[in-house]
Every structure is written in C-alpha cells, then in structure tokens.
Swiss-Prot record:
GO BP: cytoplasmic translation
HAMAP family: Ribosomal_uL6_B (MF_01365_B)
Gene3D superfamilies (UniProt xref): Ribosomal protein L6, alpha-beta domain (3.90.930.12)
Subunit structure as annotated in this protein's UniProt entry: Part of the 50S ribosomal subunit.
Record organism: Methylibium petroleiphilum (strain ATCC BAA-1232 / LMG 22953 / PM1)
Protein name from the UniProt record: Large ribosomal subunit protein uL6
Family named by the database record: Belongs to the universal ribosomal protein uL6 family.
C-alpha cells in the first residue's frame, strides 16, 4: 500500500467533509471544493480524520489511494488556509495592476495584456512589479500563475520577463567575437 495513502488526514475545526458514493466535498471558510472519488479507493471519515484504502489489491488501486489522499489533503488545506503563488516582473517599464477580477499587464508589447481571473481566484499587486495570486484550489492557482508567466517568460540573456518569485533564471553568455 502507498505510504502516503496510509497516513490519515486530520480535518481542522471549521472544515466540513461530505463523502458520497462517487464524490467528496470539502467546505470551509474559504469556499467549497468538490472532487470525484476514484472507484479504486474507499474513503472513510472517522473521528475527524479521513482515511484512504485501496478497494482491491491491484497496484493501480495502491497508487490511486496515495494520489486521492494527496488531492484531498490539498482540498482541506485550500478551504482552511488557501494557496498563493507570487510572481515578479523584471524589465524596464514592466508593470502590473489588479483591477477587480482582471490583471492588467504592461510587459513590453505595443498594447496592455488583460488577463481575466476565474471565480474563486483573487489577484493582488502589492507593488507594480509583484503579483500575488490567491485561491482555495491549488491546481487552479498554479494554472493561472503558469498562464500569467507564459505571457512573457524570462528570456535567457537579460532575464527580462515574468517569473515566479522563488525562480532562479540561469543567464547565458552573449556571443564573443
């Protein structure tokens, strides 16, 4: 059995977990998340702890029990604490501005780039060169951060572009005569 799948998830106070036959829903202060439960995994809620077990002895069921446990742990963390991704703009004249559910970027194109945020995602710009994307669904937060970074990824010679705050960009040397 998967080592990750063996560990139970402690459900914090203020988080409600409902398990149906084919889906699990987690409700907390930051919203509600719903995920289908794989038929190879059985989920039990006992004394405020969620436990996962493979439905049969196959290798796929063992692997899926660990995967489901990790996904549900992210759901529990998301509705209680939330997730955030920070991006940094590097370049002369590069600016970001949050306007409600939209992110307005000026990153060296002849026109400003406007990115709409989906429901449940908040975007903040503490400074003109910083972007903070927050939400309860870890996958959606990471996806939106990747889409924003893809607008102008860091180039390898000067490092200009949009990068994750913790990202290290390795720079190439210029051509020598």
């Amino acid at each position: 059995m998967s080592r990750v799948g063996k560990m139970p998830i402690a459900v914090p106070k203020g988080v409600d977990v409902a398990i149906n036959a084919d889906q699990i829903s987690v409700k907390g202060s930051l919203g509600t998340l719903v995920r289908p439960v794989n038929r190879l995994v059985s989920v039990k809620n006992e004394d405020g702890k969620l436990s996962f077990a493979p439905a049969d002895e196959s290798a796929a069921a063992n692997a899926m029990s660990g995967t489901m446990r990790a996904l549900v742990a992210n759901m529990v963390n998301g509705v209680s604490k939330g997730f955030e991704r920070k991006l940094t703009l590097v370049g002369v004249g590069f600016r970001a501005q949050a306007q409600g559910a939209k992110l307005n970027l000026q990153v060296g194109f002849s026109h400003p780039v406007v990115k709409d945020m989906p429901a449940g995602i908040k975007v903040e710009c503490p400074t003109q060169t910083e972007i903070v994307i927050k939400g309860s669904d870890r996958q959606v937060v990471g996806q939106i951060a990747a889409e924003v970074r893809a607008i102008r990824p860091p180039e390898p010679y000067k490092g200009k572009g949009i990068r994750y705050a913790e990202e290290k960009v390795s720079l190439k040397e210029t051509k020598k005569k």
